[in-house]
Amino acid sequence: MKERLPKSVYKSLIRTIDGGEPLDMSVADAVANAMKDWAIEKGATHYAHVFYPLTGATAEKHDSFLSPNGGGSAIAEFSGELLIQGEPDGSSFPTGGLRPTFEARGYTAWDPTSPAYIMHTPNGAVLMIPSVFMSWTGEALDKKIPLLRSNAAMNAAAQKVLTLMGEEEIATLNSSCGAEQEYFLIDEKFANARPDILLAGRTLFGASPAKGQQFDDHYFGAIPERVQVFMQDFEDKLYRLGIPAKTHHNEVAPGQFEIAPYFESANIASDHQQLLMTLMKTTAKQHGFFCLLHEKPFAGVNGSGKHNNWSMLTNTGKN
């Protein structure tokens, strides 16, 4: 963005990201045009507002950049209005009982504090725009809005305490998070023979293992070569999307592993975790594996957790 935007527009965008200032529509138009040009250069044909409804999974609607110009042809177009707000059908998403289905209207709104990215697939590329999802009256219909509101409330309360402690040079305080994702890898042919794994992501019946941690694939043990190939491919995809993968290793149970990215602001870390889990499953399939993210896929051996290393971080770098 710094290379593509006028200096005044870029500074205005940074004030919105860092300080929460309202975004002027002229700035939004310039940002949207720069994002469109960058995305098209990278092969993208569509854009999507990515949000996290109460289903517990990601959601997205792909829209083309092409727009008819009335002369029998089309142009690539992406305005600030389209960047800031989208309107998916809210009737098919859970609301927690906030409203009846026939009144369900939903809006996505761009979250400028989380970087946009381009998702490449065998069938093309899409500009993905992290967003919130809300009702027309502003009620949160997703899991990102409560996180952003919690961060804002924490910042406001902490500022008062820091001022009393003499830390007046601190302008903002944010939460940071480094999540450790544990997972199991099993051969795809074994997963395909188990309807419970395919449907529930875990085993519902079976015999206890003969041994657990007594094999050589124990905690911090040598990583099997086939798994190492998967990990290298997977982490390469993470780096391409700006996800700072830091550590990977064998976990306690046989066939269990862990990936731990470097800590980031909690909002970005949360977005990156959703993306990480999606990439983990698709990359595992490309290597003949089936990835299990269920917290307890097998009885009698350790389950998979996601430790959150959480802290409060000031704009001056103090924990």
Residue ranges and their predicted role:
Residues 106-319:
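Glycine-rich, acidic/polar active-site loops that bind/position phosphate-bearing ligands
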Residues 1-105:
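Active-site core of metal-dependent hydrolases
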